[in-house]
Protein backbone atom coordinates (compact mmCIF):
# COMPACT_ATOMS: atom_id res chain seq x y z
CA UNK A 1 0.00 0.00 0.00
CA UNK A 2 1.43 3.36 -1.04
CA UNK A 3 0.88 6.65 0.81
CA UNK A 4 0.30 9.91 -0.99
CA UNK A 5 2.28 12.99 0.03
CA UNK A 6 -0.81 14.54 1.64
CA UNK A 7 -1.63 11.40 3.57
CA UNK A 8 1.96 11.10 4.74
CA UNK A 9 2.13 14.70 5.95
CA UNK A 10 -1.10 14.18 7.88
CA UNK A 11 0.53 11.53 10.02
CA UNK A 12 2.16 12.64 13.30
CA UNK A 13 5.93 12.84 12.97
CA UNK A 14 6.53 10.21 15.62
CA UNK A 15 4.46 7.69 13.62
CA UNK A 16 5.82 8.25 10.13
CA UNK A 17 7.30 5.18 8.47
CA UNK A 18 9.27 5.21 5.26
CA UNK A 19 9.75 1.98 3.30
CA UNK A 20 12.72 1.87 1.02
CA UNK A 21 12.04 0.39 -2.41
CA UNK A 22 14.18 -2.63 -3.25
CA UNK A 23 16.96 -1.95 -5.71
CA UNK A 24 17.85 -4.21 -8.58
CA UNK A 25 21.06 -5.27 -6.89
CA UNK A 26 19.27 -6.37 -3.75
CA UNK A 27 15.98 -7.69 -5.06
CA UNK A 28 16.16 -10.75 -2.88
CA UNK A 29 16.81 -8.77 0.33
CA UNK A 30 13.87 -7.69 2.54
CA UNK A 31 12.60 -4.08 2.49
CA UNK A 32 14.50 -1.65 4.75
CA UNK A 33 12.18 0.19 7.17
CA UNK A 34 13.26 3.60 8.56
CA UNK A 35 11.29 5.02 11.48
CA UNK A 36 11.62 8.75 12.26
CA UNK A 37 10.66 9.77 15.80
CA UNK A 38 10.50 13.27 17.21
CA UNK A 39 12.08 14.16 20.59
CA UNK A 40 9.09 13.55 22.87
CA UNK A 41 8.48 15.14 26.27
CA UNK A 42 6.89 13.69 29.37
CA UNK A 43 4.60 15.86 31.52
CA UNK A 44 4.28 15.23 35.27
CA UNK A 45 1.49 16.90 37.27
CA UNK A 46 1.78 17.26 41.02
CA UNK A 47 -1.70 15.93 41.84
CA UNK A 48 -0.71 13.44 44.52
CA UNK A 49 2.50 15.16 45.66
CA UNK A 50 4.74 12.58 43.98
CA UNK A 51 6.45 15.18 41.77
CA UNK A 52 7.31 17.34 44.78
CA UNK A 53 8.76 14.32 46.56
CA UNK A 54 10.98 13.55 43.57
CA UNK A 55 12.18 17.15 43.27
CA UNK A 56 12.81 17.30 47.00
CA UNK A 57 14.79 14.05 46.82
CA UNK A 58 17.15 15.72 44.34
CA UNK A 59 17.49 18.80 46.56
CA UNK A 60 18.14 16.57 49.59
CA UNK A 61 20.87 14.73 47.72
CA UNK A 62 22.67 17.98 46.83
CA UNK A 63 22.42 19.36 50.37
CA UNK A 64 23.61 16.10 51.92
CA UNK A 65 26.60 15.82 49.58
CA UNK A 66 27.73 19.44 49.92
CA UNK A 67 26.90 19.58 53.62
CA UNK A 68 29.82 17.33 54.54
CA UNK A 69 32.26 20.03 53.33
CA UNK A 70 30.81 22.90 55.41
CA UNK A 71 32.77 24.44 58.25
CA UNK A 72 36.36 24.13 59.51
CA UNK A 73 35.87 20.43 60.28
CA UNK A 74 34.12 19.55 57.04
CA UNK A 75 35.18 16.39 55.22
CA UNK A 76 36.49 15.90 51.70
CA UNK A 77 34.66 14.53 48.67
CA UNK A 78 36.35 12.18 46.19
CA UNK A 79 35.34 12.77 42.56
CA UNK A 80 35.93 10.18 39.87
CA UNK A 81 38.01 11.42 36.96
CA UNK A 82 37.40 9.62 33.67
CA UNK A 83 40.84 10.30 32.22
CA UNK A 84 43.07 10.59 35.25
CA UNK A 85 43.44 10.10 39.00
CA UNK A 86 40.44 10.87 41.25
CA UNK A 87 40.06 14.42 42.56
CA UNK A 88 39.88 15.01 46.30
CA UNK A 89 38.16 18.34 46.95
CA UNK A 90 36.66 20.32 49.80
CA UNK A 91 35.12 22.97 47.55
CA UNK A 92 31.33 23.02 47.27
CA UNK A 93 31.25 24.63 43.83
CA UNK A 94 33.44 21.90 42.33
CA UNK A 95 31.33 19.13 43.86
CA UNK A 96 28.16 20.87 42.68
CA UNK A 97 29.20 20.66 39.02
CA UNK A 98 29.66 16.89 39.23
CA UNK A 99 26.18 15.95 40.48
CA UNK A 100 24.01 14.28 37.85
CA UNK A 101 21.23 11.84 38.85
CA UNK A 102 19.68 9.10 36.73
CA UNK A 103 16.05 9.87 37.61
CA UNK A 104 14.96 12.84 35.41
CA UNK A 105 12.67 14.39 38.05
CA UNK A 106 15.28 14.15 40.79
CA UNK A 107 17.81 15.62 38.39
CA UNK A 108 15.51 18.62 37.81
CA UNK A 109 15.51 19.14 41.59
CA UNK A 110 19.32 19.03 41.55
CA UNK A 111 19.53 21.62 38.79
CA UNK A 112 17.04 23.95 40.50
CA UNK A 113 18.99 24.00 43.77
CA UNK A 114 22.32 24.14 41.92
CA UNK A 115 21.45 27.61 40.64
CA UNK A 116 21.67 29.07 44.15
CA UNK A 117 25.26 27.91 44.68
CA UNK A 118 26.41 28.65 41.14
CA UNK A 119 25.06 32.21 41.11
CA UNK A 120 26.52 32.99 44.54
CA UNK A 121 29.91 31.68 43.47
CA UNK A 122 29.79 33.73 40.25
CA UNK A 123 29.04 37.01 42.02
CA UNK A 124 30.86 36.63 45.35
CA UNK A 125 33.43 33.95 44.53
CA UNK A 126 32.55 31.88 47.60
CA UNK A 127 29.56 30.73 49.67
CA UNK A 128 28.11 28.16 47.28
CA UNK A 129 27.71 25.51 50.01
CA UNK A 130 25.98 27.92 52.41
CA UNK A 131 23.59 28.97 49.62
CA UNK A 132 22.65 25.34 48.95
CA UNK A 133 22.09 24.59 52.65
CA UNK A 134 19.97 27.72 53.10
CA UNK A 135 17.92 26.96 49.97
CA UNK A 136 17.43 23.39 51.17
CA UNK A 137 16.18 24.68 54.52
CA UNK A 138 13.67 27.00 52.84
CA UNK A 139 12.44 24.19 50.58
CA UNK A 140 12.16 21.64 53.39
CA UNK A 141 10.23 23.96 55.71
CA UNK A 142 8.16 25.34 52.83
CA UNK A 143 6.98 21.93 51.62
CA UNK A 144 5.74 21.14 55.14
CA UNK A 145 3.35 24.10 55.23
CA UNK A 146 2.28 23.85 51.57
CA UNK A 147 1.42 20.16 52.04
CA UNK A 148 -0.90 21.28 54.85
CA UNK A 149 -2.86 23.46 52.40
CA UNK A 150 -1.18 26.87 52.60
CA UNK A 151 -1.21 28.99 49.42
CA UNK A 152 2.30 28.64 47.88
CA UNK A 153 2.08 31.99 46.04
CA UNK A 154 1.51 33.94 49.25
CA UNK A 155 4.22 31.94 51.03
CA UNK A 156 6.67 32.81 48.23
CA UNK A 157 5.76 36.51 48.51
CA UNK A 158 6.39 36.35 52.23
CA UNK A 159 9.84 34.83 51.60
CA UNK A 160 10.62 37.52 49.01
CA UNK A 161 9.66 40.43 51.29
CA UNK A 162 11.54 38.88 54.21
CA UNK A 163 14.66 38.56 52.05
CA UNK A 164 14.68 42.26 51.18
CA UNK A 165 14.24 43.23 54.83
CA UNK A 166 16.99 40.84 55.96
CA UNK A 167 19.45 42.26 53.41
CA UNK A 168 18.90 45.73 54.90
CA UNK A 169 19.45 44.32 58.40
CA UNK A 170 22.63 42.60 57.20
CA UNK A 171 24.04 45.86 55.84
CA UNK A 172 23.42 47.54 59.19
CA UNK A 173 25.40 44.74 60.89
CA UNK A 174 28.31 45.04 58.43
CA UNK A 175 31.45 47.13 58.82
CA UNK A 176 34.49 47.91 56.67
CA UNK A 177 37.39 45.48 56.88
CA UNK A 178 40.76 46.58 58.23
CA UNK A 179 44.10 45.57 56.75
CA UNK A 180 45.04 43.17 59.55
CA UNK A 181 41.71 41.34 59.12
CA UNK A 182 42.33 40.39 55.49
CA UNK A 183 44.35 37.37 56.60
CA UNK A 184 41.47 36.16 58.82
CA UNK A 185 38.90 36.32 56.01
CA UNK A 186 41.18 34.44 53.62
CA UNK A 187 42.14 31.83 56.22
CA UNK A 188 38.51 31.08 57.21
CA UNK A 189 37.55 30.62 53.56
CA UNK A 190 40.55 28.31 53.02
CA UNK A 191 39.56 26.03 55.90
CA UNK A 192 41.53 27.84 58.64
CA UNK A 193 44.75 27.72 56.60
CA UNK A 194 46.58 30.79 57.91
CA UNK A 195 49.56 30.23 55.62
CA UNK A 196 47.26 30.97 52.67
CA UNK A 197 45.56 33.78 54.61
CA UNK A 198 48.81 35.57 55.41
CA UNK A 199 50.07 35.21 51.84
CA UNK A 200 46.90 36.76 50.39
CA UNK A 201 47.01 39.54 52.98
CA UNK A 202 50.65 40.31 52.08
CA UNK A 203 49.74 40.34 48.40
CA UNK A 204 47.06 43.01 48.87
CA UNK A 205 49.32 45.06 51.11
CA UNK A 206 51.97 45.04 48.37
CA UNK A 207 49.76 45.95 45.39
CA UNK A 208 46.95 47.77 47.20
CA UNK A 209 43.29 46.87 47.57
CA UNK A 210 42.58 47.69 43.93
CA UNK A 211 45.61 45.76 42.66
CA UNK A 212 45.48 42.46 40.82
CA UNK A 213 46.29 39.20 42.61
CA UNK A 214 46.46 36.11 40.40
CA UNK A 215 47.00 32.39 41.05
CA UNK A 216 49.41 30.19 39.11
CA UNK A 217 50.78 26.68 39.29
CA UNK A 218 54.05 26.87 41.21
CA UNK A 219 57.39 25.34 40.30
CA UNK A 220 58.20 24.29 43.87
CA UNK A 221 56.61 22.15 46.59
CA UNK A 222 55.62 25.14 48.74
CA UNK A 223 53.51 28.21 48.05
CA UNK A 224 55.30 31.34 46.91
CA UNK A 225 54.33 35.00 46.47
CA UNK A 226 55.84 37.02 43.61
CA UNK A 227 55.34 40.77 43.17
CA UNK A 228 55.77 42.05 39.61
CA UNK A 229 56.65 45.70 39.06
CA UNK A 230 55.89 47.10 35.63
CA UNK A 231 53.67 45.70 32.90
CA UNK A 232 53.72 41.95 32.46
CA UNK A 233 51.77 39.69 30.10
CA UNK A 234 51.90 36.05 29.04
CA UNK A 235 53.70 36.27 25.72
CA UNK A 236 57.20 34.85 25.17
CA UNK A 237 59.77 35.27 22.39
CA UNK A 238 58.90 33.95 18.94
CA UNK A 239 62.28 32.25 18.55
CA UNK A 240 64.86 30.95 21.07
CA UNK A 241 67.55 32.65 18.95
CA UNK A 242 66.51 35.96 20.57
CA UNK A 243 67.86 34.99 24.03
CA UNK A 244 70.74 37.02 25.42
CA UNK A 245 71.37 34.80 28.45
CA UNK A 246 71.59 31.15 27.39
CA UNK A 247 71.75 29.83 30.94
CA UNK A 248 68.54 31.56 32.04
CA UNK A 249 66.98 31.26 28.56
CA UNK A 250 65.84 34.88 28.53
CA UNK A 251 66.37 38.08 26.57
CA UNK A 252 67.05 41.23 28.61
CA UNK A 253 67.51 44.76 27.27
CA UNK A 254 68.07 48.13 28.94
CA UNK A 255 66.96 51.46 27.44
CA UNK A 256 65.00 49.52 24.86
CA UNK A 257 62.71 50.80 22.09
CA UNK A 258 59.34 49.18 21.34
CA UNK A 259 57.70 48.76 17.93
CA UNK A 260 53.93 48.11 18.23
CA UNK A 261 52.14 46.75 15.15
CA UNK A 262 48.43 45.84 15.17
CA UNK A 263 48.63 43.47 12.19
CA UNK A 264 50.55 40.49 10.84
CA UNK A 265 54.01 41.29 9.44
CA UNK A 266 54.63 39.33 6.24
CA UNK A 267 57.36 41.29 4.44
CA UNK A 268 60.78 41.87 6.07
CA UNK A 269 61.28 45.01 3.96
CA UNK A 270 58.48 46.72 5.92
CA UNK A 271 60.71 46.80 9.03
CA UNK A 272 63.87 47.88 7.19
CA UNK A 273 63.66 51.60 7.98
CA UNK A 274 63.21 51.15 11.74
CA UNK A 275 65.73 48.31 12.07
CA UNK A 276 68.28 50.31 10.06
CA UNK A 277 67.96 53.13 12.62
CA UNK A 278 68.46 50.58 15.41
CA UNK A 279 71.69 49.35 13.78
CA UNK A 280 73.08 52.85 13.20
CA UNK A 281 72.17 54.25 16.63
CA UNK A 282 72.81 50.95 18.45
CA UNK A 283 69.61 50.72 20.48
CA UNK A 284 67.78 47.42 21.18
CA UNK A 285 64.27 46.90 19.77
CA UNK A 286 61.34 44.79 20.97
CA UNK A 287 58.85 44.06 18.17
CA UNK A 288 55.27 43.48 19.37
CA UNK A 289 52.97 42.42 16.53
CA UNK A 290 49.86 40.33 15.94
CA UNK A 291 52.15 37.79 14.30
CA UNK A 292 55.30 37.61 12.17
CA UNK A 293 55.68 35.12 9.33
CA UNK A 294 58.82 33.01 9.20
CA UNK A 295 59.96 34.65 5.96
CA UNK A 296 59.83 38.05 7.66
CA UNK A 297 61.38 36.78 10.89
CA UNK A 298 64.36 34.96 9.32
CA UNK A 299 66.36 38.10 8.27
CA UNK A 300 65.84 39.61 11.73
CA UNK A 301 67.22 36.47 13.39
CA UNK A 302 70.23 36.36 11.03
CA UNK A 303 71.19 39.96 11.84
CA UNK A 304 70.79 39.26 15.53
CA UNK A 305 73.05 36.18 15.37
CA UNK A 306 75.69 38.16 13.43
CA UNK A 307 75.71 40.79 16.18
CA UNK A 308 74.44 43.56 13.93
CA UNK A 309 71.17 44.01 15.80
CA UNK A 310 69.86 43.75 19.36
CA UNK A 311 66.29 42.60 18.89
CA UNK A 312 63.50 40.34 20.14
CA UNK A 313 60.00 39.72 18.81
CA UNK A 314 56.80 38.63 20.57
CA UNK A 315 53.13 38.28 19.71
CA UNK A 316 50.73 40.93 20.98
CA UNK A 317 48.84 39.88 24.14
CA UNK A 318 45.23 38.62 23.88
CA UNK A 319 43.14 38.36 20.72
CA UNK A 320 40.61 40.39 18.76
CA UNK A 321 39.33 43.55 20.41
CA UNK A 322 41.18 42.82 23.66
CA UNK A 323 44.45 42.67 21.69
CA UNK A 324 43.87 46.18 20.34
CA UNK A 325 43.09 47.49 23.85
CA UNK A 326 46.26 45.89 25.24
CA UNK A 327 48.38 47.45 22.49
CA UNK A 328 46.83 50.85 23.22
CA UNK A 329 47.61 50.43 26.94
CA UNK A 330 51.18 49.43 26.11
CA UNK A 331 51.52 52.45 23.80
CA UNK A 332 50.44 54.84 26.57
CA UNK A 333 52.68 53.05 29.08
CA UNK A 334 55.79 53.40 26.87
CA UNK A 335 54.97 56.53 24.85
CA UNK A 336 54.73 54.62 21.56
CA UNK A 337 52.33 54.89 18.61
CA UNK A 338 50.49 51.76 17.47
CA UNK A 339 50.83 51.17 13.72
CA UNK A 340 47.38 50.41 12.27
CA UNK A 341 46.06 50.46 8.74
CA UNK A 342 42.83 52.12 9.94
CA UNK A 343 44.84 55.07 11.28
CA UNK A 344 46.65 55.55 7.97
CA UNK A 345 50.00 54.50 9.45
CA UNK A 346 52.21 52.29 7.29
CA UNK A 347 54.96 50.17 8.80
CA UNK A 348 57.09 50.60 5.69
CA UNK A 349 57.10 54.41 6.01
CA UNK A 350 57.21 54.62 9.82
CA UNK A 351 60.33 56.00 11.46
CA UNK A 352 61.75 55.88 14.94
CA UNK A 353 59.27 58.56 16.07
CA UNK A 354 56.62 55.80 16.52
CA UNK A 355 58.81 53.81 18.91
CA UNK A 356 58.16 53.63 22.64
CA UNK A 357 60.81 53.59 25.36
CA UNK A 358 61.34 51.19 28.26
CA UNK A 359 63.92 51.31 31.01
CA UNK A 360 64.11 47.50 31.11
CA UNK A 361 62.62 44.68 29.04
CA UNK A 362 62.77 41.02 30.08
CA UNK A 363 61.46 38.36 27.68
CA UNK A 364 61.28 34.68 28.63
CA UNK A 365 59.81 31.67 26.90
CA UNK A 366 56.32 32.36 28.32
CA UNK A 367 56.17 35.98 29.52
CA UNK A 368 57.33 39.54 28.93
CA UNK A 369 58.05 42.23 31.53
CA UNK A 370 58.31 45.93 30.61
CA UNK A 371 59.48 48.54 33.13
CA UNK A 372 59.55 52.30 32.41
CA UNK A 373 60.98 55.26 34.31
CA UNK A 374 57.56 56.89 34.76
CA UNK A 375 57.88 59.60 32.11
CA UNK A 376 54.33 58.85 30.85
CA UNK A 377 52.69 58.84 34.30
CA UNK A 378 50.21 61.62 33.50
CA UNK A 379 48.91 59.82 30.40
CA UNK A 380 48.78 56.54 32.34
CA UNK A 381 46.69 58.13 35.12
CA UNK A 382 44.21 59.45 32.56
CA UNK A 383 43.97 56.02 30.94
CA UNK A 384 43.40 54.35 34.32
CA UNK A 385 40.63 56.85 35.09
CA UNK A 386 38.91 56.01 31.78
CA UNK A 387 39.07 52.27 32.45
CA UNK A 388 37.69 52.71 35.99
CA UNK A 389 34.70 54.56 34.53
CA UNK A 390 34.14 51.58 32.24
CA UNK A 391 34.26 49.26 35.27
CA UNK A 392 31.53 51.26 37.01
CA UNK A 393 29.28 51.05 33.95
CA UNK A 394 29.90 47.33 33.32
CA UNK A 395 27.68 44.69 34.89
CA UNK A 396 29.28 41.52 33.49
CA UNK A 397 31.77 40.05 35.95
CA UNK A 398 34.14 38.68 33.30
CA UNK A 399 34.46 42.11 31.66
CA UNK A 400 35.07 43.70 35.07
CA UNK A 401 37.85 41.20 35.72
CA UNK A 402 39.52 42.00 32.38
CA UNK A 403 39.25 45.76 33.00
CA UNK A 404 40.69 45.42 36.52
CA UNK A 405 43.66 43.50 35.11
CA UNK A 406 44.28 46.33 32.64
CA UNK A 407 44.21 48.85 35.49
CA UNK A 408 46.71 46.78 37.46
CA UNK A 409 49.07 46.41 34.51
CA UNK A 410 49.07 50.15 33.88
CA UNK A 411 49.49 50.88 37.59
CA UNK A 412 52.49 48.58 37.69
CA UNK A 413 51.36 46.27 40.48
CA UNK A 414 50.58 42.56 40.08
CA UNK A 415 50.90 39.91 42.80
CA UNK A 416 51.21 36.28 41.70
CA UNK A 417 50.51 33.48 44.20
CA UNK A 418 52.32 30.35 43.04
CA UNK A 419 50.69 27.23 44.51
CA UNK A 420 52.98 24.26 45.13
CA UNK A 421 52.21 20.65 46.04
CA UNK A 422 53.68 17.14 46.00
CA UNK A 423 51.11 15.57 43.67
CA UNK A 424 48.73 16.75 40.97
CA UNK A 425 45.69 15.77 43.09
CA UNK A 426 46.93 17.84 46.04
CA UNK A 427 47.78 20.75 43.73
CA UNK A 428 44.24 20.98 42.34
CA UNK A 429 42.74 20.89 45.84
CA UNK A 430 45.11 23.62 47.08
CA UNK A 431 44.41 25.78 44.03
CA UNK A 432 40.66 25.61 44.71
CA UNK A 433 41.22 26.60 48.36
CA UNK A 434 43.46 29.53 47.44
CA UNK A 435 40.98 30.66 44.79
CA UNK A 436 38.10 30.60 47.30
CA UNK A 437 40.18 32.50 49.84
CA UNK A 438 41.18 35.13 47.29
CA UNK A 439 37.59 35.63 46.13
CA UNK A 440 36.34 35.92 49.71
CA UNK A 441 38.98 38.57 50.46
CA UNK A 442 37.97 40.58 47.39
CA UNK A 443 34.31 40.39 48.47
CA UNK A 444 35.23 41.57 51.98
CA UNK A 445 37.11 44.55 50.55
CA UNK A 446 34.12 45.38 48.37
CA UNK A 447 31.21 45.29 50.88
CA UNK A 448 32.71 44.77 54.34
CA UNK A 449 32.50 41.95 56.88
CA UNK A 450 30.14 40.39 59.43
CA UNK A 451 30.63 37.78 62.13
CA UNK A 452 31.23 34.30 60.65
CA UNK A 453 30.58 30.69 61.54
CA UNK A 454 26.91 30.89 60.51
CA UNK A 455 26.26 33.25 63.43
CA UNK A 456 25.40 36.24 61.21
CA UNK A 457 22.51 34.25 59.68
CA UNK A 458 21.44 33.08 63.13
CA UNK A 459 21.39 36.66 64.44
CA UNK A 460 19.29 37.68 61.43
CA UNK A 461 16.72 35.08 62.50
CA UNK A 462 16.01 37.18 65.60
CA UNK A 463 14.97 40.08 63.34
CA UNK A 464 12.25 38.09 61.56
CA UNK A 465 9.57 38.59 64.23
CA UNK A 466 9.74 42.35 63.71
CA UNK A 467 9.65 41.88 59.92
CA UNK A 468 6.50 39.72 60.16
CA UNK A 469 4.55 42.70 61.50
CA UNK A 470 5.01 44.52 58.18
CA UNK A 471 3.62 41.68 56.02
CA UNK A 472 0.13 41.71 54.51
CA UNK A 473 -1.51 38.45 55.61
CA UNK A 474 -1.09 35.29 57.63
CA UNK A 475 0.26 33.21 54.75
CA UNK A 476 3.02 35.73 54.06
CA UNK A 477 3.90 35.63 57.75
CA UNK A 478 4.17 31.86 57.43
CA UNK A 479 6.73 32.48 54.64
CA UNK A 480 8.71 34.70 57.03
CA UNK A 481 8.54 32.00 59.71
CA UNK A 482 9.91 29.50 57.18
CA UNK A 483 12.88 31.81 56.59
CA UNK A 484 13.44 32.12 60.32
CA UNK A 485 13.77 28.34 60.68
CA UNK A 486 15.97 27.99 57.58
CA UNK A 487 18.48 30.58 58.86
CA UNK A 488 19.57 28.13 61.58
CA UNK A 489 20.38 25.33 59.11
CA UNK A 490 24.01 26.40 58.31
CA UNK A 491 25.19 26.73 61.93
CA UNK A 492 23.41 23.51 62.81
CA UNK A 493 25.35 21.69 60.07
CA UNK A 494 28.67 23.32 61.05
CA UNK A 495 28.13 22.01 64.59
CA UNK A 496 27.19 18.55 63.29
CA UNK A 497 30.41 18.31 61.26
CA UNK A 498 32.30 19.23 64.44
CA UNK A 499 30.51 16.38 66.32
CA UNK A 500 28.47 18.81 68.41
CA UNK A 501 24.72 19.05 69.01
CA UNK A 502 23.40 21.89 66.84
CA UNK A 503 20.41 22.66 69.09
CA UNK A 504 22.68 23.21 72.08
CA UNK A 505 24.96 25.48 70.02
CA UNK A 506 22.02 27.60 68.83
CA UNK A 507 20.64 27.93 72.35
CA UNK A 508 24.00 29.02 73.81
CA UNK A 509 24.71 31.54 71.05
CA UNK A 510 21.28 33.20 71.26
CA UNK A 511 21.41 33.32 75.06
CA UNK A 512 24.27 35.85 74.84
CA UNK A 513 23.22 39.38 73.85
CA UNK A 514 26.64 40.20 72.38
CA UNK A 515 26.11 40.00 68.60
CA UNK A 516 29.78 39.08 68.08
CA UNK A 517 29.51 36.07 70.38
CA UNK A 518 29.35 32.69 68.65
CA UNK A 519 30.59 29.13 68.27
CA UNK A 520 34.16 28.54 67.05
CA UNK A 521 33.93 25.05 65.54
CA UNK A 522 37.68 24.86 64.89
CA UNK A 523 38.46 25.12 68.61
CA UNK A 524 35.09 23.79 69.84
CA UNK A 525 34.54 26.78 72.10
CA UNK A 526 32.31 29.87 72.45
CA UNK A 527 33.95 33.29 72.15
CA UNK A 528 33.88 36.69 70.45
CA UNK A 529 34.23 35.56 66.85
CA UNK A 530 35.23 38.97 65.52
CA UNK A 531 38.22 39.09 67.86
CA UNK A 532 39.03 35.46 67.05
CA UNK A 533 39.11 36.27 63.33
CA UNK A 534 36.06 34.14 62.42
CA UNK A 535 34.52 36.58 59.94
CA UNK A 536 32.61 36.35 56.67
CA UNK A 537 32.39 38.83 53.78
CA UNK A 538 29.07 40.69 53.77
CA UNK A 539 28.74 40.21 50.02
CA UNK A 540 28.91 36.42 50.37
CA UNK A 541 26.19 36.35 53.06
CA UNK A 542 24.00 38.74 51.05
CA UNK A 543 24.27 36.62 47.91
CA UNK A 544 23.43 33.51 49.94
CA UNK A 545 20.22 35.13 51.20
CA UNK A 546 19.12 36.44 47.82
CA UNK A 547 19.86 33.40 45.68
CA UNK A 548 18.64 30.80 48.16
CA UNK A 549 15.40 32.76 48.46
CA UNK A 550 15.01 33.00 44.68
CA UNK A 551 15.50 29.26 44.16
CA UNK A 552 13.13 28.37 47.01
CA UNK A 553 10.37 30.58 45.60
CA UNK A 554 10.70 28.91 42.20
CA UNK A 555 10.71 25.46 43.78
CA UNK A 556 7.67 26.00 46.03
CA UNK A 557 5.49 27.54 43.31
CA UNK A 558 6.17 24.81 40.72
CA UNK A 559 3.27 22.38 40.17
CA UNK A 560 4.19 20.68 36.89
CA UNK A 561 7.44 19.36 35.42
CA UNK A 562 8.20 18.64 31.76
CA UNK A 563 11.14 16.32 31.09
CA UNK A 564 12.52 14.58 28.05
CA UNK A 565 11.69 10.94 27.57
CA UNK A 566 14.91 9.00 27.73
CA UNK A 567 15.35 7.51 24.29
CA UNK A 568 16.01 3.79 24.29
CA UNK A 569 18.52 3.02 21.60
CA UNK A 570 17.36 0.02 19.53
CA UNK A 571 19.65 -2.94 19.42
CA UNK A 572 21.10 -3.66 15.98
CA UNK A 573 19.45 -6.62 14.24
CA UNK A 574 21.98 -9.38 13.94
CA UNK A 575 21.53 -11.94 11.17
CA UNK A 576 20.91 -15.48 12.48
CA UNK A 577 24.04 -17.65 12.47
CA UNK A 578 24.50 -19.89 9.46
CA UNK A 579 24.45 -23.66 10.02
CA UNK A 580 27.83 -25.12 10.74
CA UNK A 581 29.28 -27.27 8.00
CA UNK A 582 32.35 -29.32 7.46
CA UNK A 583 35.25 -27.70 5.60
CA UNK A 584 34.56 -29.92 2.59
CA UNK A 585 30.95 -28.70 2.02
CA UNK A 586 29.48 -25.42 0.84
CA UNK A 587 27.25 -23.34 3.17
CA UNK A 588 24.83 -22.64 0.29
CA UNK A 589 24.81 -26.26 -0.99
CA UNK A 590 25.50 -28.53 1.99
CA UNK A 591 25.03 -31.74 -0.03
CA UNK A 592 27.61 -30.84 -2.65
CA UNK A 593 31.16 -31.85 -1.90
CA UNK A 594 33.84 -29.30 -2.66
CA UNK A 595 36.86 -30.51 -4.59
CA UNK A 596 40.01 -31.05 -2.61
CA UNK A 597 43.06 -29.32 -4.01
CA UNK A 598 46.49 -30.86 -3.59
CA UNK A 599 48.57 -29.27 -0.91
CA UNK A 600 51.33 -27.15 -2.40
CA UNK A 601 54.61 -28.06 -0.78
CA UNK A 602 57.47 -25.57 -0.49
CA UNK A 603 60.16 -26.03 -3.09
CA UNK A 604 63.40 -27.39 -1.70
CA UNK A 605 66.73 -28.56 -3.15
CA UNK A 606 65.41 -32.12 -3.54
CA UNK A 607 62.95 -31.00 -6.22
CA UNK A 608 65.66 -29.87 -8.59
CA UNK A 609 67.55 -32.49 -10.64
CA UNK A 610 71.26 -32.75 -10.22
CA UNK A 611 73.38 -31.73 -13.15
From Swiss-Prot:
Gene3D superfamilies: GroEL (3.50.7.10), GroEL-like equatorial domain (1.10.560.10), TCP-1-like chaperonin intermediate domain (3.30.260.10). Residues 377-480 form a coiled coil. InterPro entries: Cpn60/GroEL, Cpn60/GroEL/TCP-1, GroEL-like_apical_dom_sf, GROEL-like_equatorial_sf, TCP-1-like_intermed_sf. Induction: Up-regulated by light. The keyword Disulfide bond does not apply. Residues 1-37 form a transit peptide. It is found in: Plastid, Chloroplast stroma. The keyword Transit peptide applies. Disruption phenotype: No visible phenotype besides impaired NDH activity. It comes from the Eukaryota. Belongs to the chaperonin (HSP60) family. Part of the Cpn60 complex composed of 7 alpha and 7 beta subunits. Can also form a complex composed of 14 beta subunits only. Both complexes show ATPase activity. The Cpn60 complex interacts with the Cpn10 complex. Interacts with NDHH. The C-terminus (568-611) is required for efficient NDHH folding, but not for the formation of the chaperonin complex. Involved specifically in the folding of NDHH, a subunit of the chloroplast NADH dehydrogenase-like complex (NDH). This is Chaperonin 60 subunit beta 4, chloroplastic. It comes from Arabidopsis thaliana.
